[in-house]
């Protein structure tokens, strides 16, 4: 009953946000609202089903979740019910699970190594494995069991539907591989890849599996020389994964977050940075380090020679085009891409070893995730930056002045879903002088193209059902000056969803009609934490909240990595790769410049005092900011 009420309230908020006049909705709008409610109800039923099953002490067979997956009709899995493989969904899943999943039949979930050990699993002694496109700590026992560390409920909302989707597609392939006995025999022939016969067999197998040449090539990129052996593993066994949750509690998630924070707090103390102003950035661990340290730029000649050797044909071609002016890309971005690839070669090992030392000399310290959450972090001491080493695009007049007392950046690899709330809350609990919170992450765009950059000033959080209205500190001009391939979409509305597979077409259509065009997973949880940093109560549920004025800077940037309205163009079908660096770095540069300009000017000191005073006045008044429903005049967004 409560879930239905929350769903209706959410639908009403979506209608109000779209500007629909109360009591005057047309018949088709009513039908759309009902369709949205039905889509939401099926998603909620799916979530409740697996959450209920995971509360038990035993193992859960995922076969029992297949029908709920079908009913939810995930937009990421449009042909789940079809007999032919959904290659987009299949590729999405294998990119987000370790390759050891092909050898596994059981998956264990736990919050800490102590929890695993208490249940008889010494996972730290197992083989550490990783997925290509999802950061998570995985361990494989070498037989048939995978273990994953979970940081929040968002991890279960991610892992469970992904495993169910893989099982559905696995069993389609299993049936097709065994429909004709000669298919498995062909794969068992072990023909050399260089042989002409290999290409002929591949063509026959590909056509029998209904896989396009383009998708087959993607499988070759993911599995390399193991495409045939991977298909053999699928063909030999019909899959019914079992899943077991070991313990799992709210306190456990809090404990994991504090264990994650421990090494960061220790380094803060060792570097004596505790009394300095702090800027929190959620992005990745390569962007700011590259922009601030200059390690790649100082090796320009070395990296250029590496690119032109042809070890990577793409780098070779792109380097030549950039050199002769026939490619529109940015040379600095190219160097960062080349440096990443160079570090992976034997010739680049000297660079890989010296890089951390050079970065630390320039104030960039790396804190790898060893305990708790699998979220790497960086501490960047702005007082140690060397202006001549900065990327030219972030250089700011005045950086050569005395730097004593300058701020510190805490930069983290962006977390998944509700882990964002726990991370930012931990930071805000432990550091008093936070001057800015800047969030950069991937998102689905409903009205743009892959590589576009979106700036939102409204965020609807599906977790808390809160709608946040904020004054985003970034504008289109901050991004567009360094964006080559994409476009900047300003004044967007974002919705933070529960998971990639927990969205369906009715869900997305309803939000799109209500002008919500950015779909992601972290902004809402981050804003829930911001709420708790300025009020004496926990974040509410189902409220409209005005963040137009805050005691610190707030910026929100997303770059489009997914377009669900173009079938097959999700992250499973193609990744941002080199071209995605364009939007990522344009956004990172905007964040870096924003921070450096504040440090140099010092002009925001008075503004911060004014905002703090305004906040104090509001607290002494209503106690609930923005309790009324925003109207059509875009309240909640302060004029610049």
Task: Label the model's feature ranges.
Residues 2-626, 630-631, 635-640:
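Accessory terminal and edge-of-domain segments that mediate assembly/interaction
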């Amino acid at each position: 009953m409560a879930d239905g009420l929350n769903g209706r309230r959410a639908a009403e908020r979506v209608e109000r946000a779209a500007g629909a006049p109360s009591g005057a909705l047309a018949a088709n709008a009513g039908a759309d609202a009902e369709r949205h409610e039905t889509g939401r109800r099926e998603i909620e039923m799916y979530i409740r089903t697996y959450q209920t099953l995971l509360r038990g002490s035993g193992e859960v067979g995922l076969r029992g979740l297949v029908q709920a997956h079908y009913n939810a009709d995930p937009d990421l899995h449009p042909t789940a019910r079809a007999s032919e493989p959904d290659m987009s969904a299949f590729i999405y899943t294998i990119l987000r699970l370790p390759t050891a999943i092909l050898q596994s039949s059981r998956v264990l979930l736990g919050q800490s190594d102590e929890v695993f050990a208490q249940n008889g699993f010494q996972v730290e002694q197992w083989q550490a494995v990783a997925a290509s496109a999802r950061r998570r700590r995985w361990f494989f026992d070498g037989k048939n069991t995978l273990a994953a560390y979970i940081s929040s409920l968002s991890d279960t909302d991610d892992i469970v539907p992904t495993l169910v989707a893989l099982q559905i597609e696995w069993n389609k392939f299993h049936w097709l591989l065994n429909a004709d006995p000669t298919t498995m025999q062909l794969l068992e022939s072990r023909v050399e890849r260089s042989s002409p016969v290999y290409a002929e067999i591949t063509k026959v197998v590909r056509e029998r599996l209904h896989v396009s040449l383009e998708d087959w090539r993607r499988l070759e990129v993911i599995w390399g020389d193991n495409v045939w052996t991977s298909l053999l593993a699928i063909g030999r066994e019909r899959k019914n994964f079992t899943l077991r949750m070991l313990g799992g509690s709210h306190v456990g998630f809090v404990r994991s977050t504090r264990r994650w924070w421990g090494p960061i707090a220790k380094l803060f103390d060792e570097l004596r940075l505790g009394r300095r102003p702090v800027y929190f950035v959620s992005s990745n661990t390569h962007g700011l380090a590259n922009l601030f340290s200059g390690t790649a730029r100082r090796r320009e000649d070395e990296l250029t020679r590496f690119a032109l050797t042809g070890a990577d044909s793409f780098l070779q071609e792109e380097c030549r085009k950039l050199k002769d002016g026939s490619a529109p890309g940015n040379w600095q971005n190219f160097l960062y891409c080349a440096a990443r690839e160079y570090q992976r070669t034997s010739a680049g090992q000297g660079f890989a070893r010296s890089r951390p030392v050079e970065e630390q000399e320039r104030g960039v310290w790396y804190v790898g995730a060893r305990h708790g959450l699998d979220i790497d972090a960086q501490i960047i001491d702005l007082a140690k930056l060397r202006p001549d080493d900065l990327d030219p695009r972030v250089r700011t007049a005045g950086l050569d002045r005395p730097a004593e007392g300058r701020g510190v950046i805490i930069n983290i690899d962006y977390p998944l879903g509700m882990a964002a709330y726990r991370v930012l809350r931990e930071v805000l609990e432990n550091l008093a002088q936070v001057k800015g919170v800047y969030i950069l992450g991937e998102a689905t765009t409903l009205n743009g193209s892959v590589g576009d950059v979106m700036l939102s000033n409204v965020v609807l959080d599906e977790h808390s059902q809160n709608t946040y209205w904020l004054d985003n500190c970034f504008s289109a001009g901050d991004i567009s000056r360094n964006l080559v391939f994409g476009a900047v979409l300003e004044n967007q509305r974002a919705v933070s969803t529960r998971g990639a597979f927990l969205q369906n077409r009715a869900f997305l259509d309803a939000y799109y009609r209500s002008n919500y065009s950015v779909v992601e997973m972290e902004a809402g949880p981050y804003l829930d934490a911001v709420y708790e940093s300025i009020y004496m109560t926990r974040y509410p549920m189902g409220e409209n909240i005005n963040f137009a004025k805050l005691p610190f800077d707030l910026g929100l940037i997303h770059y489009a990595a997914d377009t669900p309205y173009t079938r097959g163009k999700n992250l499973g079908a193609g990744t941002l790769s080199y071209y995605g660096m364009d939007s990522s770095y344009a956004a990172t540069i905007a964040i870096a410049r924003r921070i450096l300009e504040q440090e140099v000017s010092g002009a925001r000191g008075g503004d911060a005092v004014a905002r703090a005073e305004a906040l104090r006045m509001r607290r002494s008044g209503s106690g609930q900011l923005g309790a009324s429903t925003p109207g059509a005049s875009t309240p909640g967004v302060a004029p610049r």
